[in-house]
Each structure stands twice: as structure tokens, then as C-alpha cells.
Amino acid sequence: MYIKMEVEFDEDTGALQIGGQEVFVMVFEPGQEVFDKSLDQHHQFPGVATSVVFPQLSIGTKVDVFTSSGGFGATDHHCFNYHVCNKRFVFGSVPALEIPADVREHLRIGAPITCADRLVSLVTAVHAADGAWLLRVTAARAGQVSGHARQQRRGAGRTVRAGRSVYGPVQLPYEQLKAHAFRKRRPRRDAAESCALFYNDSEVRITFNKGEFELMHWRLPGPLVSHGFK
């Protein structure tokens, strides 16, 4: 669903209106965890809670970014981002737009991102990759994984070290990992449930676990977004 709009954005206050109606926007830092029950009433996409619904976007969609200097381009890249709100883990691999450094300097949190004069996302975070800046265009990405899950415990994201692989909440050299996983035939009944996130430059892994027993293991395309705006 695209949002038909007459968008008004105040760069000084960050206030956004569509058709004269104020839009609620809360942008999270990459990986941020918050506890605020009032946010449950809003739509949540990776890195943002808002009162509007963003459409699904495909790789290659051409978008315009609201800046004082202007900015536009195609979403030819993707990146992974997430936040946790009231124990709800909201994550996804979303389209991203490569932007030059001089445009990044003019970006404003919450500024509209449009496609054919319709609101499709908001400026939320950027990622430095291979000498370029990627601006994520957060939404439910068409043809790629996004979602949410309730979780009781979550550790901080960890880098997958060279020569290691992941099982459950741990990473080990591959041969050791195979033996470790083989020993975990079933979880202890009283074991705590948890969620773990691991990443490298190109991939993100999410595991859902009961103790050290792995219940589910997802491999998703990266990179993991690592920069908000200061």
C-alpha cells in the first residue's frame, strides 16, 4: 500500500505531516532495545516505529530523499537492521541506497523518502561499506526476509571470527562445532530461551535457542547496519 500524500517536513523540529495530519515517528539506533508499551500501538519496521504503513519495496526501486540539497537514486543494495521493543525482536534485510558523503551531511532523521511522490520510508540510519555510504530504506522488503519474534533474552550482536561457525549461542571452529552440536540432542526442560545474533561483512545469522540447544538458525544477507546519526 502506497501512501498518497502531501508531505510537509520541518527540518528544525523533525515534525512530519501527511495531508495536514501529524505522523508519529520514533527512530531507533541500530540494535537498540527499548521498553515503552505505548509503542505497541504503532507499526514497526526494522529501526522505526510509526503511525503509517510503509509498502514493500523491491531492489532497484528509484526513490527521492528529502534533503536541503536534494538526493535520489535506486535501491541497488541491501542491508540488515533490527531493534527490540518490549521484548519484540523486529528485524529484516531491507533495500539500501548508495549516497555520496556530501549528501549524507544533509540527511535529517525522520525525513521522507518518496517514490513517484508517495511516501515509502523515512531516513533512519546509514552504513559505511567499501568506502561508500548506504542509506537504508526501511520497510517490509519484497522477496526477502523480514519479521518479528518475541524473545526473553538476547545477547549483543557478535562478529563471527575467521574460521568459525555458529550453533545456538556459541561460535567455534567448524570441527569443534560439529561435535558440540552432536552432543546437544535435546534441550533441558528448565533451560532458558534466548536469541543470538552473529554477523560478518556480508551475512547475518540469527539463532533461537533453549539453553545451548539450537531451535532455529537463520542465515540472512547483510551487512548489518552499524551507524545511526549523531
UniProtKB/Swiss-Prot annotation:
The substrate binding site is formed by the N-terminus of a monomer and the C-terminus of the opposite monomer. The keyword Translocase does not apply. Nuclease that cleaves host 2',3'-cGAMP. Its EC number is 3.1.-.-. Keywords: Hydrolase, Nuclease. It catalyses: 2',3'-cGAMP + H2O = Gp(2'-5')Ap(3') + H(+). Pfam families: Baculo_p26. GO terms for molecular function: 2',3'-cyclic GMP-AMP binding; nuclease activity. It comes from Orgyia pseudotsugata multicapsid polyhedrosis virus (OpMNPV). Homodimer. Belongs to the poxin family. The record marks R88, R219 as: Substrate binding. The active site is at H43, Y174, K178. InterPro entries: Poxin_vir. This is Poxin.
